[in-house]
């Protein structure tokens, strides 16, 4: 109940990166997904996002958690199915650290509000499980 109360007072919920479960693939993401599927917590998060104009941010394993929960790409916490989008190991089977080029197509985010629409930005990316897989 203390966690639900904390969410009800928050403006943003942030899922941090980091490793747990002996660095098992998606270890932290699995933990976050399990905790946030609790009905009271789920309801509190959805009220934050839908009724209070709250924000969600996920870094590293935290972004994996957003995908596992369904917040990305669906905008709501949903149960995973066999066809659910996921992040998985890179095709080369190891960590990748490189610059990627990203086109900003919307600035409907406080993190992108000063970005120039349709401009391409070079940004750093570093991950071992960064391959996004989704069915059509």
Where are the regions that the model predicts?
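Flexible gly/pro-rich beta->alpha loop and the following alpha-helix that scaffold active-site loops
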Residues: 1-57, 63-76, 81
């Amino acid at each position: 109940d203390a966690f639900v109360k904390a969410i009800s007072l928050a403006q943003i919920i942030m899922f941090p990166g980091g490793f747990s479960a002996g660095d098992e693939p998606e270890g932290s993401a699995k933990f976050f997904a399990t905790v946030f599927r609790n009905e009271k917590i789920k309801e509190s998060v959805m009220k934050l996002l839908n009724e209070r104009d709250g924000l969600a941010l996920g870094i590293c394993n935290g972004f994996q958690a957003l995908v596992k929960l369904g917040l990305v790409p669906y905008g709501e916490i949903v149960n995973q199915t066999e066809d659910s989008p996921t992040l998985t190991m890179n095709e080369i089977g190891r960590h990748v650290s490189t610059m990627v080029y990203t086109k900003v197509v919307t600035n409907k985010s406080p993190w992108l509000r000063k970005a120039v629409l349709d401009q391409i930005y070079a940004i750093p990316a570093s991950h071992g499980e960064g391959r996004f897989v989704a069915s059509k």
